[in-house]
A protein has these predicted regions:
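Conserved active-site-proximal phosphate/metal-binding subdomains
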Residues: 81-102, 108-253
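Active-site entrance/lid segments in N-terminal catalytic domains of soluble metabolic enzymes
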Residues: 1-100, 205
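Conserved acidic functional residues
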Residues: 50, 105-106
Length: 253
């Protein structure tokens, strides 16, 4: 379960809801307060932190996180400026086996998994690819939009939240590119996009949205996604492809 920990007002109740409903892992995209870590650990819930910079990973480990997700700028959603290929090994080096490091950002198949393992990560975290599955929860048109996008159809915009966020380019992102001086800090801009009817984050398939303005996070790997695949089949194919890549690489010695 992922929450915006930079919006702390509802955090205790939200974390308690995760615990009460059997959540086993809490993932934070914008930092993890120490009291949240302690509450999760007291209830046998693992805590992971999305980290876009080396110093973020250092802070996450110091706060007691069980897992660090090294997320490159290619990722959909809130993201930084350092690419996955450069970020992952630097975070692996600084974490020094204190906790597992997982790679994220622009990864969509077994080749990405094999590459992440070669960089020292112990696994991968894929977001966009798993939105394009029948099981994923999302607003109408979101999955279809992902299937139609090319690798350069995303943009890093502050228009939806006030923070840098990689999303599907549309009329709303274009407006804020042209009116950047009017963007408010988080969470005011987040609230504004909701009030504008452009942000239905977390809403389901029965929600009415305007596809030309809607908040649809997407990573740069989106251009490789051309069909909806059941999540279980997708996991199996990713692992099989990674194994094939690793086997092929072993013949190059």
């Amino acid at each position: 379960v992922d929450l915006l920990t930079a919006a702390p007002g509802d955090m205790p109740a939200q974390v308690q809801a995760i615990i009460d409903n059997g959540g086993r892992v809490f993932v934070a995209g914008l930092g993890v307060p120490r009291d949240v870590v302690n509450l999760c650990h007291d209830n046998n819930v693992l805590v992971a932190s999305m980290c876009g910079k080396v110093r973020h990973a250092v802070a996450a480990v110091a706060a007691g996180c069980d897992l660090v997700i090294a997320q490159g700028t290619e990722a959909g959603g809130h993201t930084g400026t350092v690419a996955t290929m450069a970020l992952v090994p630097q975070i692996v080096d600084v974490v020094e086996n204190k906790v597992p490091v997982v790679a994220a950002g622009g990864l969509f198949d077994g080749r990405g998994l094999a590459a992440a393992l070669s960089l020292g990560a112990e696994g991968v975290w894929m977001g966009t690819r798993f939105i394009a599955t029948p099981e994923a929860w999302g607003t109408p048109g979101y999955k279809e939009k992902l299937l139609s996008m090319a690798e350069d159809d995303t943009v890093v915009s502050k228009g939806f939240t006030g923070k840098t966020c990689r999303v599907a380019r549309n009329d709303y992102t274009q407006y804020w590119e042209e009116h950047a001086s009017e963007i408010e800090p988080f969470p005011a801009q987040f609230i504004r996009s909701i009030n504008d009817g452009a942000n239905h984050l977390g809403a389901g398939p029965n929600t009415e949205v305007d596809p030309s303005r809607e908040f649809w996070p997407a990573g740069q790997g989106v251009g490789a996604i051309n069909e909806l695949v059941p999540a279980g089949d997708l996991v199996r194919s990713i692992v099989a492809e990674a194994e094939a890549v690793i086997d092929r690489m072993s013949t190059l010695r």
